Amino acid sequence: YDTFFGAECGRLLSGSGGVRANEVDQRSMALWYALDRYEAFRDLDYSDADILLINRYILSNAVYQSVRDRDLGNPDLLDFVIELEYNHFRIPRADAHIVLDMNPENAYENVGKKGFRDYVGEQPDIYEALPDIQKRARQKYMEYAKRMPEIHIIPCMEQNKLKSIKAIGELIDKELAPLLA
């Protein structure tokens, strides 16, 4: 989280500022992430880029603000986040979203392998520490994939084990080949 708004997101995710991300209403939290992305893109000249690869884009914002414990039963935020980020802030619209699909247990185990992060140290962030959030997030990504054809689900598990980086990369290459031709 290198921008002003990114640092604020980091404080909310760590709880270090006295307010925790899971205590903030879902639209306000979505706005913090959108402002971070807006700030990151506003001065970036990507006009001559053939491919723009971005980690944790708008889908992540919509997913995680829609699956928090406090927001279960509230309206889904996908349409709000699309309007906010693409139409209002005019950040680049994704031609494709790649979702690396794995079982929630492995996803949770991977949180512990992230190592030191400036905003939380070695600990999981507020969302990563919430019980069942990986399971609900996975379900929400699958739901969004049914609504948006530009979402590509890449199966990363085989017989309950994570596939190799090479095998996952080959699946991504195959999935994106028609877009890059």
Predicted features by range, described:
Residues 1-83, 87-89:
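ATP-dependent small-molecule kinase phosphotransfer cores
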Residues 53-55, 100-101, 152-155:
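Short beta-strand segments at enzyme active-site cores
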Residues 61-139:
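A glycine- and Lys/Arg-enriched "phosphate-lid" helix/loop adjacent to the NTP-binding pocket
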Residues 105-181:
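NTP-dependent small-molecule kinase module
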Residues 12, 35, 56, 100-101, ...:
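Conserved catalytic core of Hanks-type protein kinase domains
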Residues 1-3, 58-59, 102-108, 159:
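Conserved nucleotide-binding/hydrolysis micro-motifs of P-loop NTPases
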Residues 47, 92, 149:
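Structured loop/turn residues at beta-strand edges in well-structured enzyme cores
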